[in-house]
Regions:
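Positively charged n-region of N-terminal signal peptides that target proteins for export
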Residues: 1-8
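Bacterial Sec-exported substrate-binding components of ABC uptake systems
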Residues: 20-101, 212-239, 363-376
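Extracytoplasmic ligand-binding site segments that recognize negatively charged/polar headgroups
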Residues: 91, 98-104, 116-127, 167-170, ...
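Structured C-terminal subdomain patch of bacterial secreted/periplasmic proteins
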Residues: 187-218, 299-376
Length: 376
C-alpha cells in the first residue's frame, strides 16, 4: 500500500510539474493577462501576443522573443531570460535587412531608422535613398562589417538583420555583447509569397502602427486574390537570368517567384528544378538543359535584379544568340523585371496581379506595369 501511495504521489507531482510547464508556455508571460493574438493569414515565421497595458510579445521562429513596452508603461517583473525588452518609441534602428525597408516606408516610419546596412545608391526605395542623401539615415556598414562605434554612438536600441547574419554569427554576438539586441527578419523563408508581405504586421506591432499595417497588407491580399480569381491562362513562364559565366540561373520550384507565377494563373517552366538542397533559392542550369526546358515556354521573364536591366530585345539576345530560338522570343512575349523588384516586399500582391496581366495580354499589347516591362 505504501508503494502504491508513493507511486500515486509521484505521478501527481509529475502531473503538477508538467501541467505548470504547459500553462506557462501557453501564456507566454507568467502573471500577465493575455488579451489576444495578432491574426495572421500566411506568415508562419513569427507571432505577436497581446497583453494588458499594451504589452506585445513578438516571437520569431528561431529568432528570439521581444517584449514591446509602450512609452510610459512599466516593465513587468519576472520576464523570462530569453525575452528582450524593447521600449517604444524606437529610434535609430540599424536596418541591415534590405527587404524590410519598404515596410517601414509603407508605414510612414522611416523616422525610426537611423542607420542603414545599405548605401544610398543601393536603395530602390526612393524615400530611403533620399533620407540617406539628406543625412537623416546614416550608412553604418553592411551586415557582416558594421560600424560598431557609429552604432553605439547613435544609441541604437535594435539591429534588424536578415537571415544572412547566420553567416556572420560573430557579428551578431558582438552586437549583443555591446548591448544592441538583434532581431532577425526571416520573411524570405516564408513559404507563401504574401507571407513575406505580412511581416509588415510585425513591424506595425514594433512601432505601434498595427492599423496601418493591416490596411496595407489587406490591399496586397486583395490584389493577389483578384489575380487568383481571374483568368487562368495556363501559360508556361521561364524566369531566369544569364550569369557572367554563361549559365542560366533559375529559381527552384517552390520558391516564392515560382509560387507567384502559379498564383497569377501561369505555370513555372522549371517545375522539376529542385537543385541539390541548401538555402539558396537559385540553381545554375547548363544552357543545353535550359534550352530544352525553356524552348517552348509561352512567356520569358528576364530577371534583371542582380546583373542589371536589359532595356531592349537586342540586348537580351546579345546574352546568348540561341535565345532567339525560344518560342516566346519569336512570339514577342519577352519581359524583364525592374531592378527594384526584390526590395519591394510590400508590393508582392501587385507583382502577382501584374504577372496575371502579362499572362493574359496579347502580343500587340504593352500594359504599363510597375515591376515588369516588355522587351522590344
Amino acid at each position: 500500500m505504501k508503494r502504491i501511495t508513493a507511486a500515486l504521489l509521484c505521478l501527481a507531482m509529475l502531473a503538477l510539474f508538467f501541467g505548470c510547464g504547459r500553462e506557462s508556455t501557453e501564456e507566454g508571460l507568467a502573471g500577465i493577462v493575455q488579451t489576444g493574438s495578432l491574426e495572421l493569414a500566411f506568415a508562419q515565421g513569427f507571432s505577436v501576443d497581446e497583453y494588458e497595458d499594451g504589452l506585445k510579445l513578438i516571437s520569431i521562429k528561431d529568432g528570439g522573443r521581444f517584449l514591446v513596452v509602450p512609452e510610459g508603461a512599466q516593465i513587468p517583473s519576472g520576464i523570462p531570460g530569453d525575452v528582450t525588452v524593447l521600449r517604444q518609441p524606437l529610434k535609430n534602428i540599424y536596418l541591415a535587412a534590405t527587404a524590410a525597408m519598404c515596410l517601414f516606408d509603407g508605414l510612414g516610419r522611416l523616422d525610426a531608422i537611423g542607420l542603414s546596412g545599405t548605401k544610398a545608391e543601393g536603395w530602390y526605395v526612393e524615400n530611403a535613398r533620399l533620407a540617406m542623401e539628406r543625412g537623416e539615415i546614416l550608412y553604418a556598414g553592411k551586415y557582416s562589417e558594421p560600424d560598431y562605434e557609429l552604432i553605439l554612438g547613435a544609441g541604437c536600441p535594435l539591429a534588424i538583420e536578415s537571415g544572412m547574419i547566420g553567416h556572420a554569427a560573430d557579428v551578431m554576438n558582438k552586437l549583443v555583447e555591446l548591448g544592441v539586441p538583434v532581431l532577425i527578419d526571416r520573411s524570405s523563408y516564408e513559404p507563401h509569397p504574401l507571407g513575406r508581405t505580412e511581416w509588415i504586421k510585425l513591424y506595425g506591432a514594433l512601432l505601434g502602427e498595427e492599423e496601418k499595417a493591416n490596411e496595407l497588407f489587406n490591399e496586397q491580399r486583395a490584389l493577389m486574390e483578384s489575380a487568383v480569381n481571374g483568368e487562368k491562362s495556363g501559360k508556361t513562364a521561364a524566369f531566369f537570368r544569364i550569369s557572367p559565366s554563361g549559365y542560366a540561373v533559375a529559381r527552384k520550384t517552390g520558391d516564392y517567384v515560382s509560387r507567384m507565377i502559379e498564383l497569377a494563373g501561369g505555370r513555372y517552366a522549371f517545375s522539376d528544378l529542385v537543385g541539390e538542397g541548401g538555402a539558396t533559392a537559385t540553381v545554375n542550369v547548363e544552357m543545353e538543359k535550359f534550352f530544352s526546358t525553356a524552348r517552348e515556354a509561352d512567356v520569358v521573364i528576364y530577371n534583371s535584379t542582380i546583373g542589371g536591366e536589359v532595356s531592349t530585345l537586342e540586348e537580351f539576345l546579345a546574352l546568348n544568340p540561341l535565345l532567339a530560338e525560344l518560342k516566346a522570343v519569336q512570339n514577342g512575349a519577352v519581359w524583364c523585371t525592374r531592378e527594384s523588384m526584390y526590395q519591394q516586399t510590400l508590393n508582392i500582391g501587385r507583382m502577382i496581379k501584374e504577372l496575371n496581366t502579362i499572362f493574359s495580354c496579347g502580343a500587340d499589347e504593352t500594359p504599363e506595369l510597375q515591376y515588369f516591362f516588355r522587351l522590344k
